Each structure stands twice: as structure tokens, then as C-alpha cells.
Amino acid sequence: MKRTFILMLDSFGIGAASDADKFGDIGADTFGNIAKACAEGKANIGRDGSLKLPNLAKLGLGHAGFESTGQFAPGFSQDVEVVGAYGYADELSTGKDTPSGHWEMAGVPVLYDWGYFNDLQDSFPKELTDKILARAGLSGFLGNCHASGTTILEQLGEEHMRSGMPIFYTSADSVFQVACHEESFGLDNLLRLCEIAREELGPYNIGRVIARPFIGTGPSDFSRTGNRRDYAVEPPSKTVLDKLKDAGGEVVSVGKIADIYAHCGITKKVKASGLEALFDATLEQIKQAGDRTIVFTNFVDFDSHYGHRRDVAGYAKALEYFDERLPELLALLEQDDLLLLTADHGCDPTWPGSDHTRERVPVLALGAGLAAGSLGLRNSFADMGQSIASYFELEPMEYGESFIQ
């Protein structure tokens, strides 16, 4: 029986990519800089001491970080018996965004440029917003700028509730984000508005429209809910997920995976929100998985709750929670299963600003007859997609080199 389980630690980069200079990200290292802050006592909120990830270390995380950066992250060393295959991957895709990282990992790099809203203020063309408002029957909107999602709620959340006008904002990524109060504006109204925006954004080549529902009564208690929805464009060609589905296999999305792939190549969608619920749902789907199945989970909290918010202690605590639960998952693996742990980009919480960082990602693989030891530098995330194709004996992907023979 052949099954693959993919754990996407969203934003968990392990050192600046080879082309990080083009992005202003030389020195970025999500894993290493979190470990350094922990070792220096700068991440002792809700936790304390060095970064403790013994199970990830056994899968080769520390060694992959060493190969990527030339040094072991504080608290990690070569004196660990590694049981898995480990490596690190550079990104071929032109951007450091979520769809690019996910699609490339599944064998389809994004070799074209996304559209972006580069102006920090008055970010959106009036022609675009006029069309969206007219179709939605709205009189106006708030925002129209680059912003942190939490900060803009503090600044404009109350005005949004008073006026009924949605909050439109963007970032350095190819995104159009819409924040609305889940109760006063209505979740269904927000989702319909985002569907309209997705349709109108076609000519602008924007990768995602993101619905950002929130609740609360004022700036002190506004909080996002778990009903986020991503409206992505479809990948430019078939991913390994599509190929397995087309061959009669099953592809189970846990969390926001289905949204990222525009629901292409997915046979089952499991909704879950929050690190604990995502891990619980992953375990349940592994227990149910039959032959020729992929279970693919995105652990978005690392990125959305801690990376973008530059919360080093929160990120470290979340990683330690994830690590503590790994043995539950490992106990469910069967002899021929393939487990992959990776990331889609970096989001170094010690880095200036609030955007993603251009980083290499870990490639931690266990099972499928792989020998423990180094996989070295992978020149594309697509090596993972090609390896999955090899594992399931599917038609080869156009990009990537398999590390499974």
C-alpha cells in the first residue's frame, strides 16, 4: 500500500535562498534566527530556554539547517541519530508567496511574474474598485493600502462596523485582501464580495483574493476567525495532485490546501483551524487513508499568527507543540508510507517588516525505502513533486529531479 503524507509548515524557512539578494533577504533564516533568539533568552513569553525540537531533529532538521547555512542552529548539533532523509531546497519560482511555493512543491514552478499592487497608499486602481463596489452594491470601502492584517483591524475595524464599508488592503505579495466583521457585515456577504473581486482581478494577474473575517467589539478584542478563505487562480499546468487524482488516487486536503490549489487535484476537503485542530484532523485522515492516497496539511498558523506578526516566542512555542505531537503521527506510519515535511517560503519573525522572506525550505523525508542521510541541495521545490510522482509510479513531472528511485 502506497500513501504519502505532506506536512507543510507554512513559512518555516531554513536560511536565505541563493537569490535572496534580489529580495533584500540576505541573512533571513526563520529556523536559525528563532533558535538564536531562544538561546539568547529573547523568546521566553509562554515558554523558556533553547528551542526544543527533538523529533524534528531526529528527522534531520538540524542537519538540513547546517547544510543550508553552514552552521548548526543554537541548540542543535551533529550528535543526533538521524532516522530520515534530509535536505534543503531553493525555489525556482519568481515569487516568495504561498501559491508559488505550494505549486512548485507539487511539480509546477511559477516562472512568470505575478501582478502586484506596489503603491503603499492608494494601492488599487480606481477602475478596479469601482467595478467591485458596483457589482456588490456598496457605496465605498476603507483601507486601500499595504498593511498588517491585525494592525488594520485596530485602525479601521470600528469605522468598518459603523459604515458597513469593507476594508481592502494588500502587501508585498500578489494579494487582494478583504476584511469584514463576520457578524455585522456577514460571512456570506464577505465571501460573495471576494468572489466578485476574484473575477474582476483577472486582468491584473493577482495570485489570491483572501477573505479575512473577524469578530469583536473594538480594537482591544478584534480577532480573525477560522473562516478565512483563499481564492487562488488555478495552477498553470497539472500538479502531481492532479496526476494522482486522474490515475484514480485520493488527495485529501486538510486546512487551506484546497484553496491554494484552486481546488484542482483534490478529492476530499477537511476543514480545520488552529494548530491543534489541524494536527488532530491530519491524524484522523491518516488513519482513514487507503492505498494511493495523499493527505496534505498546511499548518498556516506558523505564518499567519507568528511569522507575519513577528512573534518569535509564539513561533517557537508553536514549533515545540508541533514537535511534541509528531510521535503520534509517526506511530501511524506503515512500512511503505512516505512522509514529507517542508515549507513554502520563509517568514522570519526577527526580520524587518511583516512580509515573507526568500528562503530555502527543509526537505525532510521518511519511509518509501529512503536511506537515512543527506539529500543535499535540491535546486527546486519541484524535486518533491517529482519524487511523489516516482513513488506512485505516475507520469513524470516536467520539472524536478526525484530523490526516490
UniProtKB/Swiss-Prot annotation:
Single Gene Ontology MF annotation: manganese ion binding
Entry EC number(s): 5.4.2.7
InterPro entries: Alkaline_phosphatase_core_sf, DeoB, Metalloenzyme, Phosphopentomutase_DeoB_cap_sf
Signal peptide positions on this chain: none
GTP-binding as UniProt keyword: no
Gene3D superfamilies: Alkaline Phosphatase, subunit A, Phosphopentomutase
Gene Ontology CC annotations of this record: cytosol
Annotated compartments: Cytoplasm
Cofactor: Mn(2+)
Swiss-Prot/TrEMBL GO biological process terms: 2-deoxyribose 1-phosphate catabolic process; 5-phosphoribose 1-diphosphate biosynthetic process; metabolic compound salvage; nucleotide metabolic process
Details of cofactor binding: Binds 2 manganese ions.
Keywords assigned by UniProt, alphabetized: Cytoplasm, Isomerase, Manganese, Metal-binding
Main location as per UniProt: cytoplasm
Residues that, per the record, bind Mn(2+) 1: D10, D344, H345
Record's keyword annotation contains Manganese: yes
Record's catalysed reaction(s): 2-deoxy-alpha-D-ribose 1-phosphate = 2-deoxy-D-ribose 5-phosphate; alpha-D-ribose 1-phosphate = D-ribose 5-phosphate
Binding positions (Mn(2+) 2): D303, H308, H356
Similarity annotation: Belongs to the phosphopentomutase family.
Protein name per UniProt: Phosphopentomutase
Organism the protein comes from: Shewanella denitrificans (strain OS217 / ATCC BAA-1090 / DSM 15013)
Gene designation: deoB
